[in-house]
Design a protein with these regions (language model features):
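Sequence/structural signature of beta-propeller domains
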Residues: 22-524
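Fungal secretory targeting signals
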Residues: 1-24
Length: 524
């Protein structure tokens, strides 16, 4: 049997005490379903009924390879067939979580990409309130790990891709690759070259495979159930990062052993910006449509400046056959927020980059957009924009798939992020506010204020939708769902381990950031 957590004794005892605290008999939701928020998008009405759950993973938990179980909020996907309501009224299911490239506060490391298998148990807390807050009622247990490799079985790496050159395999596009010194952690080792992955999006294939989107390429990869790379999707040329008129996959994120390894110029002249690649990925329930989206606008159409990069692109692929087919492309105008730390009003309005998308039963997409630099472990604790919103395409939405926009340096917007005439983006509709104080208080959580374990983390980057059982539904004309969202803790801990447990670290911030998870109740 796989261990629950390999972590410090204090964290384990604390976690088990919470599990016991929220267990119990059958629970019943209130008769009247409250409406905390509502939006209409693409002709569909969506209602938010409140925060239904909260869970954590200790910052020093490790997987079966002895590595810190961090970064798992980068993406999650739930096996829909596993999600069931138990006789006691609780819900259980299997989730897969995707860490990004590893702890990189002091530089990127030779961390092998992986997917983490988790079990989830949600025990409803219908009486939770600000006056009587519930303890964490979402139990998250670690089950297993699958390591990701290249087509030849060579482990992947989180080290920044080389500024020039790439790795080649028959039947694959040029792949981002890193030349590794020593063991890739600052010690002695064999070196070599590996495919660079900064994983950010995850979807489950109907054949048991894993679809993964990454920021370095930006590419989409398909891996077997055992973790071997089977396929790579290269986006149109406009997306590919270029420096000095040459393909350049580096994200200007030098390795820990060579902090001066910065490409020139630092920012790509066109294509995806550094660390703003394919942040979001989702697949339709029938397994035929794949959607992937950039975190923000490309450098030839508003990037890299945060106040201009609001025109992001959304790609749609047909994956029903043996080979994927690029079919549609759309513009998504991202929301903005006012950075209250900026003294210059002309520079204070910034783009809320998106961190995830999720296919909805209506055919619309949910999109997670947020500010950055605010939350637990940051210099400022109060976030002003952290939402799960809705985007909807219609017959009036412009399909921008064309040579004009997809060629090298092809642009849909000006350098200040203004869309070109004639382009109609998808409809964008604000929906669930993560920062709503009245809902957070039900679980003793808060946005802004003290830097304690109940302060929301900065980076919320994942979405997964699961159904509410018909016995618990209170909305007769709509379908009800739980929306599960994990935060990315960036592997920040004072008791960290990587390189199969051999590399020990303590983040210089002094913080221990638990992975936080929220569960929202909604209907559509």
């Amino acid at each position: 049997m796989a261990p629950l957590w390999n972590c410090s004794l204090s964290s384990l005892l604390w976690f088990l005490s919470l599990s016991n605290a929220v267990s119990g008999g059958r629970v019943y939701p209130p008769k009247d379903l409250p409406v905390v928020g509502e939006t209409t998008c693409g002709g569909h009405t969506y209602q938010y009924h409140g925060l239904a759950g909260y869970g954590i993973v200790p910052s020093d938990a490790v997987d079966k390879y002895g590595d810190t179980l961090g970064g798992i909020g980068s993406a999650i996907a739930v096996e829909q067939s596993s999600w069931q309501r138990k006789r006691d009224g609780s819900y259980e299911g299997i989730a897969w979580a995707l860490p990004d490239r590893g702890w990189n506060t002091n530089g990127t490391l030779n961390v092998q990409a992986r997917v983490q298998k988790l079990s989830l148990k949600l025990t409803l807390a219908p009486t939770a309130s600000a006056e009587n807050p519930s303890k964490p009622n979402l139990q998250i247990k670690y089950l297993d790990t699958i390591l990701l490799t290249g087509p030849d079985g060579t482990p992947t790496t989180g080290i920044d891709a080389d500024a020039t050159g790439f790795i080649s395999f028959p039947g694959f596009p040029p792949l981002p690759g890193a030349t590794i010194n020593g063991d890739g952690f600052g010690g002695a080792g064999p070196g070599g070259r590996r495919i660079s992955l900064d994983c950010e999006g995850l979807a489950l294939g109907r054949d048991g495979s894993f679809w993964v989107s990454d920021e370095y390429g930006p590419y989409v990869y398909k891996f077997s159930r055992r973790g071997r790379m089977l396929q790579a999707i290269q986006p149109p040329a406009a997306y590919l990062p270029r420096r000095n008129n040459t393909l350049s996959f580096s994200a200007a994120s030098p390795p820990i052993y060579d902090p001066d390894q910065i490409p020139v110029p630092e920012d790509p002249e066109c294509g995806r910006n550094n660390n703003q690649g394919f942040e979001a990925l989702t697949i339709s329930p029938d397994g035929k449509k794949l959607f992937v989206m950039l975190q923000s606008g490309m450098n030839q159409e508003g990037g890299p400046k945060k106040r201009n990069r609001k025109q992001a692109r959304l790609l749609e692929y047909d994956i029903s056959g043996r080979k994927q087919r690029y079919v549609h492309e759309y513009a998504v105008t991202l929301p903005t927020y006012v950075d209250y730390t900026e003294e210059n009003p002309e520079k204070a309005t910034l783009v809320a980059s998106q961190s995830e998308i999720h296919y909805l039963p209506t055919g619309d997409l949910m999109i997670l957009a947020r500010d950055s630099g605010f939350g637990h472990g940051q210099s400022e604790s109060r976030s002003v924009y952290r939402r799960a919103d809705i985007i909807s395409k219609s017959r009036r939405t412009t399909d921008i798939k064309s040579y004009q926009y997809d060629r090298v340096n092809g642009s849909i917007a000006s350098s200040t992020g203004v869309l070109k005439a004639g382009i109609r983006p998808v409809e964008y509709c604000p929906f669930i506010d993560y920062n709503l104080a009245s809902e957070l208080a039900k679980f003793g959580l808060h946005n802004g204020g003290e830097q304690d374990r109940f302060l929301l983390n900065e980076k919320w980057e994942s979405l997964a939708l699961v159904p509410v059982d018909r016995r618990d539904r209170r909305h007769h004309k709509k379908h009800e769902y739980f929306l599960i969202s994990f935060s990315d803790n960036d592997y920040i801990t004072q008791n960290g381990r990587l390189n199969f447990g051999k590399f020990k670290y303590a983040d210089q911030s002094g913080f221990n950031l638990e992975t936080q998870a929220l569960v929202f109740h909604l209907s559509l």
